[in-house]
Each structure stands twice: as structure tokens, then as C-alpha cells.
Amino acid sequence: MKPKVLKIIPKSKNLLPVSIGGNNPLFTIAEIGLNHNGDIELGKKLIDAAHEAGCISVKFQNFETEDVYIEGKKAGKYELLGENIEIYKLHKNLEIEFNFLSELKQYAENKGLYFFSAPMGNNALKMLMDLDCDLVKIASYEISNLPWIRKVAETNKPIIMSCGGARLEEVDRALNEIYKYHSNVALMHCVIKYPALLHEANLQIINTLKTAFEIPVGFSNNGFRHKSGEIDYETAPHAAAALGMEVYEIHITLDREMDGVDQGFSTEPNELKEMISHVNATRSKFLDSQNIEVDEICIGSGIKKTLECEKYVRAFAYKSIFSIKNIKKGDKLSMNNIKCLRSGE
């Protein structure tokens, strides 16, 4: 059976059409995410770093905080890299406007980079549609939120969907919702622990997902470290490429010492350039059926389940149903009186 591919047809004349999967080159994503810190010039410098490293695309996150967490301090604090962060306030400070994204999209496309985002909420998705982005990302935390998945699929844009923390049956349900509209989709294996230990990478899941769903599968790298605490930027991406990943996503920063929630586990420009060169070379060897040595520590069992190290983030950030109005006995539940939000603390 001929492998399915995800096809992206760009609107910008500065971009070439892309096919992901099969015998095609690796599709590389520089995840800028929230690391722009609300500063458009910092965002441009990160796009420059992605371009200089040889990435094919840059990805952001956009949202209105009310569509992500319950309002104010009720959302609680999130533990990351030894700090307890007031999560609602953090997101509120990182909301970005249409003009901010529009300028960065134009800047990226002028450099020949695809630009897209992981939207959170209807207004965020509308912003991307108004920008006419060429593809959309569905974050791991949305994979059980079937109404949202339908909403994204209705746009008929190509979708890259992460499935960190999910069980195989949850991935199956989410894909079936997308298939009601189209099949132009790729999956991303990731571990929702920031950063995780190398032995928690379980990269064999890449092949588990390929076998189960027969669509392109990639690896979203949220950072890995040794038990000593030392960050490792080489072992996991090399092994993922050797196992046949078709998309590679990595968080980037100009400096891990910068302020910002995700800076501390992100990849700096010099590391990024070396990493992208390395994974592309490994991808070429894989396509040529060459023997590739990998460190067995990050291969894992290949069983797709919620890992022990993912349970905290899954409980905090996967979507739950909240009432947004007083609901009386006998009232019908609808999006007028309930909302899907991250659970929080």
C-alpha cells in the first residue's frame, strides 16, 4: 500500500508546495511558541534563527486566555522547572493580536518559511483563518476535545496533531473526527513533560502510530535530560529520525537564561543549526535503508499510553467541562452554558 502523505499547498509565492511522509524529506518545525515574550522584534530574531538553521517552518501559539483556563487565580499554579507559575496571569500576559501575528507571518514567508500556529479557542482559530495560514496545529491538550477537533477540521486546512499523554484509543477517536472532513493530517509523538528523562522518550511509538493509522508521523521534542540533570539535544532526535519520523518539531530560544516559561528547555541557535543538519542527514540515511546506530535508552516499549511522567501535565492541561452559567435541573447542556477549558490546579 502506498504510504499516505500530507500535502501543503502554500498561498505565498515565496514558498514551495510540501509533501510530508513517504519518501519525502523531513518537515522541520521551529516551535517559537511563547518564547517571543510578547516582543515582535524578539519574534523576528527567532524566525531568523530558524531560517539560518535550515528549518522549513515556524510555529507559534495564539489564544485568548478565557478560552484556555478558568478566570483568575482559580486556574491555580503550574509547576515547571522548579517554579510555581500563576498560569492564568502568565497566559494573559502573552496574548497576541492579529497585527502581531500578521507581521510575523509576512516576515517568515519573506524568508521562505511556512508560518502556522496552535490556536486555542474559536477567536484564535478565526485569526489564523483570517491570516490564511497554510496549516494548523492541534496541541496534545486538545486531543480529547472532540468539538474543537471538529471545528479545526471544518476549515479543511492540513492538520498536524500532537498526541502527548494520550491513549491509543483517544488518538483514534480524534482522527475519526478529522476524517469526517478530510484526511490531510499528520500525527506527532511527544512526551508532555518539560523536559523528560531520556528513558521516558518511548520513540518506538512513532512506528506504533504509523502501523495503527497509516499516516505521516513525526516527533515533537519538548526537551530531554539525563538523570544527572544534563540536557541532551542529540540522542532523542537522532533516534527519532533513525526510526522514521517524518516531521520534527523543536522549541527554540535565543538564550535559555532569558525570562519566559519555555525558555529553559528550548534549543539555542547554534544547537539548533547542528541539530537540524544532523536529523536531515539521519533522515537521508533512513530513506537509503542504511544501518543507523542509536542509543537504546530512548526507544522504549512502543506502547501508546499515558506515561507516569505525563500524568501531572495531563491532569492540569487536558480539557475538562466547566459551567459558565448557573445550570438548573432539567436544563440542556450546550456551548451556551458550558465550556471546555484546561483543568488547572
Residue ranges and their predicted role:
Residues M1-E345:
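Catalytic cores and adjacent flexible loops of soluble metabolic enzymes
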